[in-house]
Amino acid sequence: MFSEANAKAGVTFPKGFQAAGIKAGIKKSGNLDVAVIYTEKEAAAAGTFTKNAVAAAPVHVSKKVVATHAAHAIVANAGCANACTGAQGEKDAAAMQQIAANALGCAPDDVIVGSTGIIGQLLPMDKVEQGIKAAVKELSVDGSMDAGNAIITTDTYSKAGATSVTIGGKEVRFGIIAKGSGMIRPDMATVLCFITTDADIDGVLLQEALSEVIEHSLNMISIDGDMSTNDMAIVLANGAAGNPKITEKNADYEMFKETLLVLCQGISEKIAADGEGATKFITVHVKGAKSFSDAKTVGMSVANSPLVKTAFFGEDPNWGRVICAVGYAGVPMDPNHTTVKFGGIPVYADGVGTSYDADALRTVMTAHDIVVEIDLKDGDSEAKVWTCDFSYEYVKINGEYHT
């Protein structure tokens, strides 16, 4: 259901949505840095946000919009996070709402704001204002790719996807763009992620669906264990598909939620694979746990371990680092019953390392995509966590990312 064929259409794949991305001069690189996503028809709105206590000004502003369950637009910039900027930062985030509202002909409270970039610097509001106005003039059904490129920072490419499903006899479309490469760990959405759909769904149910989906998708990524001040995932549903409005948790709701999950899991894998300096995409599959929470905790412990991540960069089948991370995760486990496999090859069982085919394991470790399977043999629950390795390039990228 995650369609690469429609990925370029992204957030403008659903009916009634337009987007644009332009160069406002906020990024030192001179690349695209202001994005606008718009629906003339009012949309139900939902969002999840960072749990970092040092939340950025745009997070505060956008939470208020999402609380109304309605919006018309998303405006976002890259190159400056507008975080730790005090009262002026709050005023600037509100000004972004007002500027966009004036240009679009909607109310400021209908505009969600996102920012990403360097912390502690005030937005260059003259550039931001001109950028928003220019982006509104450039809005089109072909603007999703530019919008996606306008929100990235250290990403090597923009992330996008789209899909469709039949709900209530109508084709319902979904689109997504996201940024995320470093400063990613769970506890909300972990990235800037903007989702659109032409489904007709109650705003409260939309929020419930998004919150559940995020827990099983974007919150299952870990690149470097850091949680940003600016993280948010937003979904707008404008009802243009004409499906019978989803007002209860029935079969239509479940279909909607499942499609949203597939979309978000697909984008999560793209984000993890594009970790800063990453050379490996690693899936940590924990099964045999007593609960999803336990499985996730163990998976995150392994995914967050610098020793595990550097071992995979070095293509070293160091199962000791993996079982060590399992052991200190805080989830009760029996090391004599737990098993570990790399690429389907058993490397640890019955409390000791196994005898394995070195050539076969070398093939696993030199591949780009690697699956680490951990079976706790203590229940029926499972979870998949997506991560990447730590390379020399990761240190270089972040060492050179100056304020």
Region locations from a protein language model:
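A structural signal for small-residue-enriched, beta-sheet-centric alpha/beta enzyme cores
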Residues: 1-77, 81-92, 101-403
